[in-house]
Amino acid sequence: MKIYIDADACPKTLRDFICKSVMRTKTIAIFVSNSFINLPRSPFITIKVVEQGFDIADNYILEKAQANDLVITSDIPLANDLISKGVAVINFKGVEYNKDNIKQSLGMRDFMDMMRSTGVLEPSQMGKQKPFSDKDKKTFADTFNRLHTKLSRMLKNDLK
């Protein structure tokens, strides 16, 4: 199992949590970004800097992630594509995307995108994204730990 992180939008507190967790559990984490980010030195932590451009990091993650890997991203179309490959996906707020909820999330995202692009929603009506809270961090940590444990157990069972 590998963990891929869509690192450009990942809050620093989550990067720190993920790094500590993968060093403790000896799990490989690959932070994918279009610019360098400072991460701890560890044989379990890699940063993959991709070219600048639309969906370059997403395409790298989609190409490399395999069934039973874990991807951390808030990109809903990417999550949809990954789920169809059997990849576990969570966002930065700790929401697990799966085959039961991804279509609804994708539909809402597309609807809001259409509302913005047609001018029905003005920027002032959209509101600002809420700041990342301690509750968000706890929810993320709980979901991350649950999925990490589940995927690790599946891997161990496959090796038997």
Where do the model's predicted regions map?
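Nuclease catalytic cores that cleave nucleic-acid phosphodiester bonds
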Residues: 1-160
